[in-house]
Amino acid sequence: MSKKQNSSISRKKIKRQILEGIAHIHASFNNTIVTITDRQGNTLGWATSGGSGFRGSRKSTPFAAQVAAEKCSEIAKEYGIKNLEIMVKGPGPGRESTIRALNSSGFKITNITDVTPIPHNGCRPPKRRRV
């Protein structure tokens, strides 16, 4: 019995040059997720506060969100992105610091949109917390 050798050549994805991108920021109370996409919505890269080395309650700090945004800006620069449109979702503490970090990374921010989902009397919210 001869063994077949799998020719699984690990090919790196070819980085295409993109001028404009969208930064989706999901800022929850526990974590901040930053995703860079192209204009069609295809994901190019992402970073989170938890993935940046912060655990527990430190994930929900503005500094952790800033570090995640800086990680994401390096990914965007690999693709050659110059202009960013920012979409912010959620009420978390990392909203402002993420936008400031992306701005200071050298991107030209074209517009900032708040896309936080607001129910028009949808589902009943959970009961109030009593501590």
Curated annotation (Swiss-Prot):
One of its GO terms (cellular component) is ribonucleoprotein complex. One of its GO terms (molecular function) is rRNA binding. InterPro entries: Ribosomal_uS11, Ribosomal_uS11_bac-type, Ribosomal_uS11_CS, Ribosomal_uS11_sf. GO terms for biological process: translation. Keywords: Ribonucleoprotein, Ribosomal protein, RNA-binding, rRNA-binding. The keyword RNA-binding applies. Signal peptide: none annotated. Gene3D superfamilies: Ribosomal protein S11. It comes from the Bacteria. Belongs to the universal ribosomal protein uS11 family. PANTHER family: 40S RIBOSOMAL PROTEIN S14/30S RIBOSOMAL PROTEIN S11. Part of the 30S ribosomal subunit. Interacts with proteins S7 and S18. Binds to IF-3. NCBIfam families: PRK05309.1 (NF003698), uS11_bact (TIGR03632). Located on the platform of the 30S subunit, it bridges several disparate RNA helices of the 16S rRNA. Forms part of the Shine-Dalgarno cleft in the 70S ribosome. This is Small ribosomal subunit protein uS11. It comes from Wigglesworthia glossinidia brevipalpis.
